[in-house]
Design a protein with these regions (language model features):
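Amphipathic alpha-helical assembly/interaction segments
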Residues: 1-118
């Protein structure tokens, strides 16, 4: 349980950091790429919360991992179209790698209580 709480805390912190950055995107990118990034963040958060309480935890975690990869590309695109500074992209990439590792560790950890009772 400690792992899932840490990942939720870390992901929330990353989400807050990212939203503060997408708010600074120029108008055209804020209402296209910025919104897409924010929606992806909310989707991943929802999947992590569902994994925390679901019997099908790994299904939600695998899906969250895929969404995290899409988010990596969106963040990279933000850097490439020059709406996110290289330094900020570096921080985002490290944060996403850490979150991805935590998801992987959660997948490999012992089954959820619901799964153990089956």
């Amino acid at each position: 349980m400690a792992k899932d709480l840490k990942i939720l805390s870390d992901f929330y912190d990353f989400m807050l950091w990212t939203i503060r950055h997408t708010e600074k995107f120029p108008r055209h990118h804020r209402y296209s790429l910025g919104i897409a990034i924010e929606n992806r963040l909310q989707t991943i958060l929802s999947m992590l919360l569902r994994a925390r309480f679901s019997k099908d935890r790994n299904t939600w975690l695998f899906d969250a991992n895929i969404e995290l990869d899409v988010l990596r590309f969106q963040i990279r695109l933000a850097k490439d179209v020059k709406v996110m500074p290289v330094k900020s992209h570096g921080f985002a990439a490290k944060s996403l790698d850490s979150i991805g590792s935590q998801i992987g560790g959660w997948i490999k950890s012992k089954p959820a209580k619901h799964e153990a009772l089956r």
